[in-house]
Each structure stands twice: as structure tokens, then as C-alpha cells.
């Protein structure tokens, strides 16, 4: 039963909105808008060459985070996404605790989580496909690291390096 309204409470499995992710051909092309016009500060970023993408997160004064994704290499999920859907919203990430239990709960409720990846304790994830979520890819994520340590763990590139490689 997917409606979620029967027996619904104000609680839920998501602890908080983590970030909104935008697919772009070049992160460097988005930085002037995100940083200089809208006022976000660079938080962290890295190149995930094995997965065919680079990412950069920017935090706004109120705490909201936008993540920019750009493809690296000649193929991969992000390059495919940009070919079929063009630049724009890629996914919304929600933080959860005990992600494996949350995945089972979703399945029990009739949802079909896809692409679970629980190998890295610093970032465990599972997705809800846009076909089931009114066109929005939803990522549920859990990290065993405190948030400050996540930034330290993932801040592999400073912004200038990231933009130069973009």
C-alpha cells in the first residue's frame, strides 16, 4: 500500500533533507551563479572516476545544500542522464538511520528500492526510482561519520582544483 496516508503520523523514516543534486555538463559553469550570485559557499567535492562523475556541494547561509554533478569519462549513468534528460534536477537525498531496515520497510510497504550500496560505512545509499516517485529520483543515505568528519573525508578537491578539472 503505497499511499502512505493510512495510519500516517508526523514521524517518518527520513531524518532530514541532506541535499538536492543538479546534473550539469560543467560544474565550473554553475559556480558563478551558485556561489557569487546566490551566496552559497563551497563545502566539499570529489571526482568519482570509477563511477564516471565529479561532484561539488555548496551550502547556503540557512543550511540548504545543492550538489552539482558533472560527468567524467566517456560513459556512465550521468552522461546517459544528460543525453536523455538534459541538465537539471538529478535527485533529492534524504538522510535516514539504519538504512537496511528502512529499505525493508519500504519493500514491506510495496515500494521497490533500487541500487542499494551498503559497502562504504561513510556513505550507504539506496534509491527510489522516478517511475515510482512522480519523476524524482530519491536517494536515501546513511553515514556512520559525524557531519564534520564527512566534510573532511570527502573534501578531496578544493574548489579551484575542481573547477580547473571541470
Regions found by a protein language model. Give the residues of each.
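Long, hydrophobic N-terminal alpha-helical segment
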Residues: 13-54, 58, 76
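Regulatory and interaction patches adjacent to catalytic/ligand-binding sites
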Residues: 81
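Short, flexible turn/loop "capping" segments at secondary-structure junctions
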Residues: 10-14, 84-85
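Feature marks short, surface-exposed loop/turn motifs that line or immediately flank catalytic pockets
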Residues: 72-75, 144
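Short, structured motif recognition centered on aromatic/hydrophobic residues
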Residues: 17-24, 34, 58, 63-69, ...
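Vicinal oxygen chelate
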Residues: 1-12, 24-32, 36-38, 46, 56-59, 66, 72-73, 84-132, ...
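Short loop/beta submotifs within extracellular cysteine-rich repeat domains
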Residues: 30, 41, 64-66, 76-77, ...
Amino acid at each position: 500500500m503505497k499511499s502512505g496516508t493510512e495510519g500516517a503520523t508526523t514521524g517518518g523514516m527520513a531524518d532530514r533533507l541532506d541535499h538536492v543534486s543538479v546534473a550539469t555538463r560543467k560544474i565550473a559553469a554553475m559556480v558563478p551563479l551558485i556561489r557569487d550570485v546566490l551566496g552559497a559557499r563551497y563545502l566539499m567535492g570529489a571526482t568519482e572516476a570509477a563511477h564516471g562523475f565529479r561532484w561539488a556541494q555548496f551550502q547556503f547561509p540557512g543550511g540548504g545544500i545543492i550538489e552539482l554533478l558533472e560527468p567524467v569519462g566517456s560513459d556512465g549513468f550521468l552522461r546517459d542522464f544528460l543525453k536523455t534528460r538534459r541538465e537539471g534536477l538529478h535527485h533529492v537525498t534524504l538522510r535516514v538511520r539504519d538504512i537496511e531496515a528502512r529499505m525493508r520497510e519500504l519493500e514491506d510497504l510495496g515500494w521497490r528500492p533500487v541500487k542499494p550500496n551498503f559497502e562504504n560505512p561513510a556513505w550507504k545509499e539506496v534509491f527510489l526510482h522516478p517511475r515510482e516517485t512522480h519523476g524524482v529520483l530519491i536517494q536515501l543515505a546513511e553515514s556512520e561519520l559525524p557531519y564534520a568528519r564527512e566534510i573532511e573525508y570527502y573534501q578531496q578537491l578544493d574548489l579551484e582544483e575542481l573547477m580547473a578539472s571541470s
